[in-house]
Amino acid sequence: MSMLQVLRPALPILAGAAIMLTISMGLRQSLGIFLQPLTKDIAISVSSFTLAIAVQNLAWGFLQPVAGALTVRWGYRPIMLVGAALYIIGLALMAVAQGFLAIMIGAGVLIGASMACTGPAIAMAVAARSVSTAVRSTVLGIVSAAGSLGALMAAPIGQILSEGHGWRIGIAGFVVMSLIMLPMAWIAGRTDKQPTPTTANEIGDTSAKAAAITAFSNASFVVMTCAYFVCGMQLIFITTHLPSYLAICGMDPMLSAQTLGVIGGFNVLGSLFFGWAGGRWSKQVLLGLIYVSRSIVLAWYFMAPPTTTGTLVFGALMGFLWLGVGPLMQGAIVEMFGLKWQAMIGGLAFMNHQLGSFLGAYGGGLIYDTLGSYTLAWQIGVSIGLTAGIVQIAFALLRPPQQPLLATP
């Protein structure tokens, strides 16, 4: 039986989840293109804008396990619909902002809360529930690949609108694109009518507190969660600060949008590859290899002045290594703990990812405002990335994943 035949009953749900994810991730990853014109127009500092992005990441991270736990009680559809509505409101508030407060609430709090309801953890939990074990890792890679197709479209569209009509019209264009999330969330919500498949290590019926205790009793999960910090730090540093870095270096403003688009395009290939690879080799070793490889690419790029070709090659390499982490993390969590609490446990791991994102966004802006350069910021990112990747690989090779120790409610 072909892959298409296996997936046919789940195709509407998978398409809804994938399109919702590609819009939510794509628009968010492209907000950095508005950094320079927005901050100059409403007279706020670079670090103020990046503080809002940092708060977005914290809100996303700390609300992710809450959203995941609520899907067990209320179902996925209402959570995703609320998230889509919050995204639209957040972007609209940004488009009419006259100062820092509106940017903080719109780009920070509202979009952050929305991402907890529409981002990778929820989208991939929906996908994982809808397919069999045999194709699950590959399907998670496909859905993860969709996460950057939005950036492939959104970044160039936003840049063109911003250059031609101003940054407010650019963000208004994002508002229009975000409306697509509402019907997609509704369609993906059909998964609520499906019974939850069971797995060998399924935690099953228990409380959220007991599920969390079970997760953190697993040493492999703890190491994987700690290493996840570097993923958020590196990726948010790039999406938030690369446009500003290229502008400082006197490069064509369109280059940043083109590079974000290249990242999106090559992420499709990377996510598909790592989704496929995760079904064949150790997911945790592959995670460590991604962190090490990203760090090497970052060091290579920032050690020399940027060129057009070098920047696009950097975008291609980083894109390949971008969201491949998603299917590997979610697949490993399903293997360890099952499907019922996947979204919540994935959210617990994601909190650490978002602490890294806070450091990448706000820390990068603070270092730039203080030193007038991004040199120290990328050096920190490379050092921490190499350390986390090596520890992740060593632990995965020396200690196989533990069976879950079930906690009592």
Can you annotate each of these PLM segments?
Residues L31-L35, N218-S271:
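Extracytoplasmic gate region of multi-pass secondary transporters
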